[in-house]
Amino acid sequence: MYYFVTASKDASIYLQQPTQNTGLDEILEVSKVYYGNLKDTARSLIKFETTPLSSSIASGEVTMSNAELILRECESNEIPNEYSIYAYPISQSWDMGIGTRFDEISTDGCSWENRKTSTKWLIGSASLESSGSFNGKGGM
């Protein structure tokens, strides 16, 4: 049996654009790029509404022993032959926002610095009890 849960909200955040929001952008970015001595990092935030799934598991309607996160790549450049992507839980609520990467630039919503428009992320508040990772084979 398959049970699909799609993201209820998502956004990419950028080290070099620390207040920019991309909640309405159609692309999620994960990257680490160097421009000379300048490092730019992009991370993706993805929220899944899991309450219905939790209820279905508790009632016995859904039984499962594992889960998969399926992401697709597009416009990849200079991917190394081997790489790892890690997933961590976010311990704070965040606003998806209304911005896009290049067309509708906005600072409303989450960003590298803020989890909501004017609310900073709390540093060191995450629980690293659970995580996920992917070790992929890349290259073009």
Predicted feature residues:
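Secreted, disulfide-rich extracellular signaling modules
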Residues: 1-140
